Structures are given as structure tokens and as C-alpha cells.
Amino acid sequence: MTNPRFTIIFATAALIAAPVYAETELSFYFGGQSSPHSVVTGTDPGNDVDDTPDFTAKWEGRSFEAPIYYGWRATRWQSETFGWGAEFTHAKVYSDQETRDEGGFDVLELTDGINILTVNAYRRWPNQFGALTPYVGGGLGISIPHVEVESAGGKTNGYQVTGAALRLTAGAKYAINETWGVFGEYQNTVSFNDMELDNGGALESRIITNALNIGISYSF
């Protein structure tokens, strides 16, 4: 499976190589990310609790434990108010002990991570409050988690492209000068994950993440 870091590098290179009409902005962020419960269904041959699992998983984000939660994006502003770009987020979900006991799993997590890669569109309102520029964005893309599943039926550990992903963002950027800025934002992702297991089974789950991000941006 191709490492998602190479995928985002190629996507960003293609973006920057395109003709620049106005402004290119590179942003990096980290923050606190959580995930609500989600239903997990599928098949897990050899699972000593249920080989056709169907349960609600309780997820933990653990944003500041290695590997930490982070993201970065490249945006091309084609006008003062409209832009588009590519974004990569390294989020994480860990199941709790109760969830693993209920489903018959020793390990059930997407922790390196549940990687979300999207193409986004943005709308901003420049200098709406002095040096503060509010913005909103949304995008479509793919989920590339590092699937870590272990039960009596076997072990799965590796990157997979598991399905579609959606992203919504709302935030504000404070301009330090014409080049550098800092920002804070709320970000939501939804990913539809169909994960293959090495024992021939499969698990499905729609996973939502909610995050409060802070970051720095460089424009040129």
C-alpha cells in the first residue's frame, strides 16, 4: 500500500506547479481532535466473540500522544475571496477497552492514522475585522487509514484506501504581515471506511472527527 505521505506530496506538487494567478498559501496546524461513537459491522473469521461483529465503538483521539494529530494544506487563492487546494490531516481513533471486549478484539484502532486527503474550495472575507480574516471551506476526497486490528481470528496492520471522505472547516486568520499569519479553526471530517482484514474478513464504519486547530500560514 502506498504511504499517504507520498500521495499528499504529489498532490501538493501538482497544485503548486499550476499557474499562480493570485496567491499561494501553505498552512500547517495541530490541535485537539475527538471522535464520537460509530457503528462497526462486518466479518472477522475466527473471532472468539462474534465472527459477524455488529457493535458501537467508543473512540478516543489522544491528539497529543505520538503519533500526534496534525495537518497541512496548500491553497491557491484565485481572487481576494475564492480559493481551492489540497489538504492532508493525520487524525487518530483508538477504541476503548469496553469496545474491544464487546467486539472480541485485542486491538482496534486507526492510529497512524485515519489519514484524510481532500480537494477543497474556500471562501474568505479579507480584513473583515482589521487584520482578522474569517473563512469557510469544504472538500471531498479519500480516507487512507493505517488499519490495526487484532483478534483470535488474526492480525491486520497496514495502510489501506478505505473509502470517501468529506471535510468542513470554519476559522479565522490573523495577518502578522503580508507573508505570515496565524489561524484558529474548527474542522469536521466524515469518512466512510471499508477495511479489509488479512484473514479474509472486512469491517465497515463511518467515522466522524471534530477538531479545534491552531496553525501558521505562509503566503507568496
Protein language model features and the residues they cover:
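N-terminal signal peptide c-region/cleavage motif recognized by signal peptidases
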Residues: A17-P19
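Short glycine/proline- and aromatic-enriched beta-strand/turn motifs that initiate or cap beta-hairpins
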Residues: Y21-R76, N213, S217-S219
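Residues that define the transmembrane beta-barrel architecture of outer-membrane proteins
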Residues: A66-Y70, G113-L117, L132, Q160-L166, ...
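Predominantly the C-terminal beta-signal and adjacent terminal strand-loop region
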Residues: S38-V39, G46-P53, W59, I176-F220
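Gram-negative (and chloroplast) outer-membrane scaffold detector with strong preference
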Residues: T75-A152, N210-F220
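Strand-connecting loop/turn motifs
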Residues: Y21-E25, G32, S79-T81, F129-T133, ...
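Bacterial N-terminal signal peptides that target proteins for export
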Residues: M1-I8
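Extracellular loop and loop/strand-boundary signature of outer-membrane beta-barrel proteins
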Residues: A57-E60, E102-L110, E150-Y159, D198-E204
